[in-house]
Every structure is written in structure tokens, then in C-alpha cells.
A protein has these predicted regions:
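Proline/glycine-rich low-complexity loops and linkers
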Residues: 1-3, 203
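A conserved, positively charged/aromatic
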Residues: 6-7
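Small-residue (G/A/S/T)-rich helix-start motifs and N-terminal tracts that mark the onset
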Residues: 10-13, 18-171, 175-205
Length: 205
């Protein structure tokens, strides 16, 4: 996934037998354009196990169906976002907006910043509140955007890890887990669906 020496940006790239990780990671997508695979009548899975799986819109087609006209937000799940400490409220608001964008019915954003706004003017349907006042019953919870790494953040993360709802761990939630064996143990013990979204530095921790 790295350009070496004099490199041009292709509009199309043909690769043989199977996709290569470098075409899909780091700088690869910016240089490859549209990618096609020529199998050469070779069944790649019979040769080597895959190193990973690419994420494509088709994977989510069943979950991102257009809403019926005769519906309302209460029928499409309650998403929670927990984060937004002082100076980082925007990170939690962006996550909340993303939850709306992918179809969540109601989105609650719990903010740690005591001076956080009461409304997001860009998406006033977001329900903003103090972090400790998020509803207990959520369809899914994302924790970490702008969370910070203080004691209060760690306490809230521990409670989230103990909850039964599906959980997305991002940003500072990953930083906290990376340095705390007790949080790591809670993460390993979870039975509900759990998704980690690290960038390379967070993954390295």
C-alpha cells in the first residue's frame, strides 16, 4: 500500500488470481482506480487462506434498506454515542450524525463536557445530554469519540463494557483499553457484539 519511486495514479488496475492487500490499504486505493481481478482459472482459496476481507457496500445492503413511508423513528432503533469531553465535543456530534445517516431512529449523544451545547444546529434531531444521562436501554452504543482518558471516562467505559448491548469502541476508548488490564479483561469477557475501529497507532497499543 505504498508508492515506491516514480508512481502514477491509475484509472484502472488489473491484478491476477486474487486481490492483494496493498491495493486496498494505506495509499493503494488512491493509486489503483477501479480494480478488477483475473482469476486465471485458479481457485485462490485453495492455495492460501485469506489475510483479510474487504468491506463493500454489498455487505450492508440488507441493513440499509429505504424506510417505508408509513413509519417513524421509534421503529428504527436507539443508538447512543458517549464521548465529547472538553474541547472534543465535535467528535461525538460527528459520530451522532453518522448514526443518523445510516438509519438509526433515535440517536442520543452523551457528552462529558459540562459546557457542551444543548442542541446540534446542524442536526437538531440529535438528542444531546450529559454523559451519565444516556438511556440504559439502547440498540447499540458507540463510545470513544472525544471521550478523553481521565478517570470519569474510564469509569464510563467499564460500565459500557459490562452492558449487554452491541458496542463500538473508537478513539479514546481504545486508548483506555490499551493501557488498562482490567478493561482488557472486561472486553474479552463480553458476549454481545463488539466492534473495534482503531487507526494504526491505536491498534499498535
Amino acid at each position: 500500500g505504498q508508492p515506491l519511486g516514480a508512481t502514477f495514479r491509475a484509472t484502472h488496475t488489473t491484478t491476477f488470481i486474487a486481490l492483494k492487500p496493498g491495493l486496498l490499504t494505506n495509499d493503494g486505493p488512491d493509486y489503483c482506480g477501479d480494480i478488477s481481478v483475473q482469476r486465471l482459472d485458479i481457485d485462490c482459496p485453495a492455495c492460501l487462506p485469506p489475510l483479510g476481507h474487504s468491506i463493500t457496500p454489498a455487505l450492508f445492503a440488507g441493513s440499509l434498506q429505504p424506510r417505508p413511508r408509513n413509519t417513524h423513528k421509534g421503529r428504527h432503533g436507539d443508538a447512543g454515542v458517549l464521548g465529547g469531553d472538553t474541547g472534543m465535543v465535535g467528535a461525538a456530534l460527528l459520530a451522532g450524525r453518522a448514526a443518523l445517516w445510516v438509519g438509526s431512529g433515535r440517536v442520543y449523544v452523551g457528552l462529558l463536557d459540562p459546557g457542551a451545547p444543548a442542541v446540534d444546529p446542524g442536526r437538531p434531531e440529535l438528542m444531546l445530554r450529559q454523559a451519565r444521562k444516556l438511556p440504559e436501554q439502547l440498540t447499540a452504543l458507540a463510545i470513544g469519540p472525544g471521550l478523553g482518558t481521565g478517570a470519569e471516562a474510564a469509569t464510563m467505559l467499564a460500565a459500557a463494557l459490562d452492558a449487554d448491548c452491541p458496542l463500538v469502541l473508537d478513539a479514546d476508548a481504545l486508548n483506555l483499553v490499551g493501557r488498562d488490564p482490567a478493561l482488557q479483561a472486561r472486553l474479552v469477557a463480553r458476549e454481545a457484539a463488539t466492534l473495534l475501529t482503531p487507526h494504526p497507532a491505536e491498534a499498535a497499543r
